[in-house]
Amino acid sequence: MPQPERVADYPRPPELRASDDAVRVEIGGQVLCDTVAAGGTAGPLAIWKVCETFHPPTVYLPPQAMNLALLEPAAGRSFCEWKGLASYCDLVLPAVGEHPSRRLQRAVWQYLDPTPAFAPIAGWYALYPGLMDAVWLAGERVLPQPGGFYGGWITSQVVGPFKGDPQHPHLI
C-alpha cells in the first residue's frame, strides 16, 4: 500500500491528477455514481482528482458513470480562481423503499467551460460526500472534508490537517 499523501505538500495553484480508483456513490436507496459498472469489462472509468494545499482531493466523476436522471440544474453559480465558473445541480431523489423522496439543493457541481489548466474536467461532476449516504473510493469509505463548504474526499491515503477543520482554525 502506498504511503499516505500529506495535503500540506499539495500544490497551490491546485493540480489535476488522473486516477483509475473505482468510485461508488449511494444515496436514498439509489446509486448516483458507479465507475466500475459504467466501465464494464474494461474496468472502472477514470476519474480526476483536484489536489490543492491543505485540501483532501476533490473528485470529478465522468458523466457516463453518473445517474443523470437524479440531477436537475440549479440556480446560482460560484467562481473559483483556478477552475472558473461552476454550475450546480440539485439531487432529486424519488421515494425508494423506506427512503422518502427529497431534494438536496446544490449537492453536485460541474465546470462546463473551465480554465485551460482544468479543461479535462469540463462537464464532469463533483459532489459533497457529506450529503451522500455512502461514498467509496478504491473500496474505502470516504469521509467528507470538515466544514460543509468544501467537497474534499478524505481516505486513509491523505493526511491532514485539512482546511475547514475547526480544530485547525488557522486553516479556515
What are these model-predicted stretches?
Residues 1-172:
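Terminal leader/tail segments of proteins
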